[in-house]
């Protein structure tokens, strides 16, 4: 039995003459481009202020980045769009903090508080 996905692939192949089986691969194009750009802007700001990848070496990072994320979320919730120091959106700052927390959670044991 032919699935709808196979029909689409067959019609694309018939039209272009080429094949590429990437249905099970990650689709980075699904990332929201504006949020991604804003996050990279925050990371660049931080790299200039401190140094690239400084976030990996911050003591007590889980607590500190969780607190920073909350501060940015609360500032945004209270109506402040941009961080006064960076001039960048509070939600982008919060996204960076969340990404740092996620990376630390994966890189280190869950019990580690580094």
What is the role of each PLM region?
Residues 1-114:
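Intrinsically disordered, low-complexity regulatory regions
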